[in-house]
Design a protein with these regions (language model features):
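Long, internal low-complexity/basic segments
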Residues: 25, 160-177, 182-245
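A generic secondary-structure signal for well-formed alpha-helical elements
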Residues: 33, 58-63, 76-80, 121, ...
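Polar, glycine-rich mid-to-C-terminal structural blocks
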Residues: 70-76, 80-112
Length: 245
């Protein structure tokens, strides 16, 4: 079996590390001689947590030891295209302390907690700490965005410049809720969260998302989300006493 995929979207502002379509929707191609029929495109939602159970089943190894993912061998070996498993009609997305670039008064690195649900038509996002900067603080040069000519161009813009809105979309603080019509707006450029036309849809998606998060024991659903900011940071910590700008 040969699997071709990617771990995240492009290393550009508002993509890598961000919960927008191009940040988490990655390619996934499988070749398995004699098992997978070519020329098919499957619409079922799968996540990286589903890959290990799938590979174990393909190798005929019992993987029933606490994995959260579910094998999608049935999708690979099916001869159908489109939606195969009706239960795989959405994906839950979670972000916590993925990045660096923001800290509390003690210099402890803080995360940017997000939960989201993606369906065929919609992406609904909840930003639990909208008072924080989503890709790191300005004084630390937005450290959760990789350095690149694109980042340099955007951070060099000033209010009133022609492209300044792209700076705001990439680096500015975000609202508590975001809602995108994926088919019409695949790049997630127009937040519809304040559009009353979609309030009922958003409420329905939030309830579905939170029910699933409660079922899986997400601490943030039980008022214990701040625990994620208290774990020791094991990587190379940023010296928050040195402001970049």
């Amino acid at each position: 079996m040969i699997v071709v995929t990617s771990d995240h979207g492009m290393p550009f502002p508002r993509i890598k590390g961000q919960i927008y379509e191009e940040g988490f929707h990655v390619p996934f191609i499988v070749y398995w001689k004699g098992k997978v029929m070519g020329g098919r495109s499957v619409d079922d939602f799968i996540g990286f947590h589903d890959i290990a159970p799938t590979l174990l089943e393909a190798a005929q190894i019992d993987g029933n030891f606490g994995m959260t993912g579910k094998s999608f061998i049935n999708l690979l070996t099916s001869k159908k295209s489109g939606r195969i498993d009706k239960k795989r009609d959405h994906m839950i997305l979670i972000k916590e302390r993925h990045d660096v670039g923001r800290a509390n008064e003690d210099g402890v690195n803080l995360g940017y907690p997000v939960r989201a649900i993606r369906t065929d038509e919609y992406l609904y996002v909840v930003n639990y700490k909208p008072e924080r900067w989503p890709v790191g603080n300005p004084e630390y040069d937005y450290r959760n965005c990789d350095n690149s000519p694109t980042k340099s161009y955007l951070t060099g813009l000033k209010p009133g410049d022609k492209d300044y809105r792209y700076n705001e979309m990439a680096f500015a603080k975000r609202p508590g809720e975001e809602f995108y019509l994926i088919k019409e707006d695949p790049h997630c450029m127009k937040n519809q969260a304040l559009n009353p036309e979609y309030r009922k849809v958003m409420d329905k998606l939030r309830k579905r998302m939170e029910n699933e998060l409660k079922r899986t024991g997400d601490p943030r659903m039980y008022g214990k989300g701040d625990i994620f900011d208290k774990y020791p940071y094991m990587g190379k910590a940023l010296d928050y006493s040195k402001k970049i700008k």
